[in-house]
Amino acid sequence: MSCRAGKKLFQWSRVKSSTEEIVKQLTVPLREHAEPILTLTPEQKREAVRLKIQEIEHTKGQPPFFDMFMREHTYLRISLTEKCNFRCLYCMPAEGVPLKPKDKMLSNSEVLRLVKLFAAHGVDKVRLTGGEPTIRKDIVHIVEGISSTPGIKEVGITTNGLVLQRFLPQLRDAGLTKINISIDSLDREKFAKMTRRDGFDKVWKAIELARGYYPKVKLNVVVLKHQNENEVVDFVNLTKDRNLDVRFIEFMPFGGNEFKNDNFIGYREMLNLIVDKYGDGVIRLSDSPNDTTKAYKIDGFQGQFGFITSMSDHFCNTCNRLRITADGNLKVCLHGNSEVSLRDRIRCGDSDEQLSEVIQKAVNNKKARHAVFRNGRSEEPAKSSNDSYRGLTPVTSASSILVHLPSSSLYHSHLHSSRHFFISQIRCFSTTYSVSSITHLLTHVDNNGNAKQVDVSQKDTSTRTAVARGTIILTAEISRQISENTIKKGDVLTVAKIASILGAKQVANLIPLCHPIRLDFVDTVFNHDIENSKLHCISTARCSGNTGVEMEALTACTIALLTVYDMCKAISQKMMLTNIYLVHKSGGKTTYTIDNENQI
């Protein structure tokens, strides 16, 4: 080897090593992406949630939509149409996709009603998507209606830009605050190949027009290997003297786009290309809360760039997004198949309260992460909501435990039901209260210490809710068979769920001084801790009446656990029911909420 050749090889190795080292530093996860969404102590979390809910309920009047992982959903994406005037390679086949009839699509008024409903629950950001949203003829009126909805702070649109010039001035005047334009190549021929349409000039003119209207315009670039990855640096160069935020999007699988791993290029590989060009001039920026983008910029450049890394490094921990399809289906995860039709509910005459319950139920079923990244490998999107990965069967209102945290005292008037027990506790604490001063606190005991039923005829009728929790400790074998649904008697959790409903209906026949109640709703959900051989149960009861449903919730929970015992006792009697307690009650004179049994 000549001296000159050896010198070149040394220089190349040093550059490569330097690039790898820079990329390694640049891809260290930021705290908001590397850590779970909740990093507070339990006490801090309870206080933060209580204050946040108080703030939102004070201004909006409705509790926010929290999922079972305490992610608050404040961002709504609405697809306005299935139609598109492009046929992008990564999005749909050349012949397009089958379209639903127009009467199956959400109307203008239905869209605005849903926006108003979500805004009442704390959603403050709405983005309009498609298909191509600018195809919709009433797009300007929709933007105007959304922007004028109380509580909505941002209205954005994601568009391919083909006809944007025609509408942009009107959209801005109507209240459009954010704009994302999709453009996957800066080469006209390649652009036409990737979109199967000749529209580069119109799209570029739309970008330039938008730059004059908005302080920052986002460009969405889906990067495909062997297609446009060689343009990554060219797109970054656009940010030198332009107010652009270029977002490189990893190719994702979804219906109709014929996803192939051969076309996939991860963000670290893209970042390598940029660092090879700019070296340590690449700067990592801080990401905003709930941001989907890992943000960067080149030192001295006006704009910035980033990566949406749904495939290689998910951002599910901070996901605050919900989606409504053009035909009115609610999706809590882009990668999930689970949907619920809000359109059908609206057209059947559901009230806003009923719609809110449907939405909360769907949000409760949102998984910790989208299916593509379970167990560290790529998998098919979830087919069933009864998912052992989460250990949760479908839930309805368990998260209401978290969205009704009170600021009032945790005193519970039915905690002690025995006069003797109450007085013995008083002696332990050296108090000097008389029996008569104590028994008036016990609503089922008169001044002489005799049992009585409470007269509820003068109480106001209101919606009463109660939630109870309990646990059954299992053997490892029973736990395994429940998870695999191989118990000989049948589906344990389904039978226990039904039994809990039947049990709640029998409370007045079982507890002597309880009033018969017309229940509006009873539901039980299970959280199976397979590793520790525990099955946790949460039961919710609700009624519209003049007395509470705490006993119904507690009975439902207890009966559910007893049913599990009965279904499994042929395997082993070594099971124990434990920690059955009231978690939450609301709707009456007092509200009561507790996070765990240690607070009792």
From Swiss-Prot:
GO biological process: one example: Mo-molybdopterin cofactor biosynthetic process
Keywords from the UniProt entry: 4Fe-4S, GTP-binding, Iron, Iron-sulfur, Lyase, Metal-binding, Molybdenum cofactor biosynthesis, Nucleotide-binding, S-adenosyl-L-methionine
Pfam families hit by this protein: Fer4_12, MoaC, Mob_synth_C, Radical_SAM
Binding site for GTP: 77, 127, 158, 218, 321-323
Domain Radical SAM core positions: 68-284
Residues binding [4Fe-4S] cluster 1: 84, 88, 91
Region (Molybdenum cofactor biosynthesis protein A): 4-371
Binding site for [4Fe-4S] cluster 2: 316, 319, 333
Catalytic activity: GTP + AH2 + S-adenosyl-L-methionine = (8S)-3',8-cyclo-7,8-dihydroguanosine 5'-triphosphate + 5'-deoxyadenosine + L-methionine + A + H(+); (8S)-3',8-cyclo-7,8-dihydroguanosine 5'-triphosphate = cyclic pyranopterin phosphate + diphosphate
Start and end residues of each stretch annotated as Molybdenum cofactor biosynthesis protein C: 396-595
Cofactor section: [4Fe-4S] cluster
Source taxon at top rank: Eukaryota
E.C. no: 4.1.99.22, 4.6.1.17
Gene Ontology molecular-function annotations: 4 iron, 4 sulfur cluster binding; cyclic pyranopterin monophosphate synthase activity; GTP 3',8'-cyclase activity; GTP binding; metal ion binding
Gene3D superfamilies: Aldolase class I, Molybdopterin cofactor biosynthesis C (MoaC) domain
Alphabetical list of HAMAP family matching this protein: MoaA_B
UniProt subunit comment: Isoform a and isoform b probably form a heterooligomer.
Family according to the record: In the C-terminal section; belongs to the MoaC family.
Protein name per its UniProtKB record: Molybdenum cofactor biosynthesis protein moc-5
Organism: Caenorhabditis elegans
Organism classification: Eukaryota, Metazoa, Ecdysozoa, Nematoda, Chromadorea
